[in-house]
Design a protein with these regions (language model features):
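N-terminal phosphate-binding loop and adjacent alpha-helix
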Residues: 27-66, 91, 95-102
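Glycine-rich phosphate-binding loops at beta-strand->alpha-helix junctions
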Residues: 294-313
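Phosphate/pyrophosphate-binding loops at sites that engage ATP/ADP/AMP, CoA/4′-phosphopantetheine
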Residues: 55-69, 169-173, 282-295
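Glycine-rich phosphate-binding loop plus the immediately following alpha-helix
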Residues: 107-110, 128, 143-179, 187-188, ...
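Glycine-rich phosphate-binding/hydrolytic loop that grips phosphoryl groups
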Residues: 304-305, 311, 324-354
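Short glycine-rich, Thr/Ser-proximal phosphate-binding strand/loop in the N-terminal lobe
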Residues: 4-45, 205, 209-210
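Adenine-nucleotide phosphate-binding core of ATP-dependent small-molecule kinases
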Residues: 237-292
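Short beta-strand-loop/turn "lid" adjacent to the catalytic site in phosphate-handling enzymes
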Residues: 58, 62-104, 125, 133-145
């Protein structure tokens, strides 16, 4: 039995969990008010506060346990391969001093290493697993149509690869031998084609389908006009925070839109059907990447809780492959399962190179 501690830092919280193999024994969310975090100038200034709180929690709730590994949520690294990355000084230095963006997940590696050193068995490793910048895209998929812009692999890699592993197990085939299409839709959205264990193409949240808050891909000529009518920050906000459902209804809560639809609101029904329509188009696009050889299609994220959207997607895509619905996110389970595969020598970890 392997004892694994998981750390998932977010903007105003740190989620932690203790697993024995893949069984969750304990979980807790340490929350912070904006006032508590206000004195800190940057994310890494919060390290001591968050670490102290984690250590206190371990001493109180999980006494006398020595962890075989500690795994943290990834961070905004340059493009990396999928799977586990061993936490070392190079990795921490990049996340601290040269991250692509400031984000709480950049603390995951440092927190994991510190906890492993204090509460792990002798030489217990610490990892991050499947950060959002996992990049296994085929070179042909990077071509955008402009020599000034490359398509990027940015998406919900941790959850998408985790649910692909889960469905592969249900189908009794190795993930490394199957072909899967995974769509994650929540506040943002992304979709991916998995071919023989590699995520060979990714549709990011500025392409194709809209979500609760993002516009997705929108008509470019009209978008160019919008750029000249508003500032960069205004356009960014309109497309990334006030797009999607927020743009049409002023809320990112899909449940409220469903209530409107259930009460006869035709606009609500049309927009929700359009969301399912665009999700289906993304699936169709990725099916061509896999040349139609698809073992399963998976819809995940918050929107997968919608029976209306799930059913509408199913109507359009099940001629390609069976559709599996896996609502929500499985980040903590995914981190623990990834670390367990490394400890059991089912996967090898990667070493980050500057």
């Amino acid at each position: 039995m392997k004892k694994i501690f998981v750390i998932n830092p977010g903007a105003t919280s740190t989620k932690v969990a203790y697993y024995e193999n893949t069984t969750e024994i304990f979980s807790h969310e340490i929350t912070y008010s904006l006032e508590q975090l206000k004195p800190f100038n940057n994310i890494f200034d919060q390290l001591s506060l968050r670490l102290t709180d984690i250590e206190s929690l371990i001493k109180e709730k999980i006494p006398n346990h020595k962890f075989d590994a500690v795994v943290g949520r990834g961070g905004l690294l340059p493009p990396v391969d999928a799977g586990a990355i061993l936490v070392d000084e190079n990795l921490i230095d990049c996340l601290k001093n040269r991250p692509l963006l400031e984000h709480a997940s950049n603390l995951g590696a440092s927190l994991a290493k510190s906890v492993a050193e204090k509460f792990g068995v002798e030489s217990a490793p610490s990892f991050i697993y499947d950060p959002v910048t996992v990049d296994q895209m085929n070179d042909v998929a990077r071509i955008s149509g402009s020599s000034l812009i490359d398509r990027k692999s940015v998406g919900h890699a941790l959850n998408m690869r985790a649910v692909a592993h889960d469905v592969a197990n249900k189908l009794n085939i190795p993930y490394e031998s199957g072909n899967f299409i995974v769509v994650h839709v929540g506040g943002g959205s992304s979709a991916s084609a998995h071919e023989n264990g590699r995520m060979v193409d990714v549709i990011s949240d500025d392409e194709v389908m809209f979500s609760s808050e993002r516009t997705g891909g929108i008509p470019l000529k009209q978008y160019i006009n919008l750029c000249y009518e508003k500032t960069k920050s205004e356009v960014t906000e309109l497309t990334r925070k006030k797009g999607g459902l927020v743009s049409y209804f002023g809320t990112n809560d899909a449940r409220k839109i469903h209530e409107l639809m259930d009460n006869g609101d035709e606009k609500a029904e049309l927009v929700l059907e359009a969301m399912a329509y665009q999700i289906s188009k993304a699936i169709g696009e990725l099916a061509t990447v896999l040349k139609g050889q698809v073992n399963a299609i998976i819809l995940t994220g918050g929107i997968a809780r919608s029976n209306f959207i799930s059913d509408k997607v199913r109507e359009r895509v099940e001629f390609i492959a069976p559709l599996f619905i896996i609502p929500g996110e499985k980040e903590m389970q995914a981190l623990a399962s990834g670390a367990l595969r490394v400890l059991n020598n089912e996967e090898k970890y990667n070493v980050f190179e500057k």
